[in-house]
Amino acid sequence: TEVSRSCYLSNGKWPVSCIIRVPVGAYGSGGPYHSSSVESVLSNIRGIKIVYPSNGADMKGLMKAAYHDPNPVVVLEHKGLYWSKVKGTEAAKVVEPDGDYIIPLGKARIALAASKDRVDHGQTLFVVTYGMGVHWALNAAKNYPGQIEILDLRCIAPLDEEAIYAGAEKHGRVLVVTEEPVNSSFAQSIAARIQQQCFKFLDAPVTTIGAANLPAIPLSEVLEREMLLSAEKVAAEMGKVLG
């Protein structure tokens, strides 16, 4: 806690610039020891910054921003996205936008845009997600051409609330996707904020989908798949919200 508060309490006189890289996420039947997602725990530590890239280019740009930040930055790295080891994550392999670039902390990106015609007819859904959730959403969106817009948060803290609320107001239907169990999660807090800030623009309650609410991820690969999200589960939830 001292490290996270140092820059703030000293008014910038004692910055603590450090990068803490944390491999996270379920991959390869790691069970309860190596498969957890911890963004909800970390997001309650005031003073630290948290990034969660979904592709290689974002990883580099966010790491460089973290290097220059005067506060501790935790970089969450999903193990299944290393070399796109998990089927359906080919989009994690991207070409660098430039030889030297920095992605500002707290700046989300549109990973997939909905078609203007669908937006004008009120037939779209806004998906807010990050990390592996981006790839589940991208694959699930293939079932609803032009109807899905996906916001890749890239940063857990600071959070790009402006982009979140703008998307919610534009589309009227919102689905928040996380790998964590939903109860008491960071994703659920996003849904609550959207509901509070954008209520008059919503056509349906904000929905959150994540892993089953179990104490730990099973060692069994079969049970692991049953507990975790997948593109198929996300697609089914998209259909429910779209009606």
Feature-to-residue mapping (PLM):
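Short secondary-structure boundary micro-motifs
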Residues: 4, 34-36, 92-93, 211
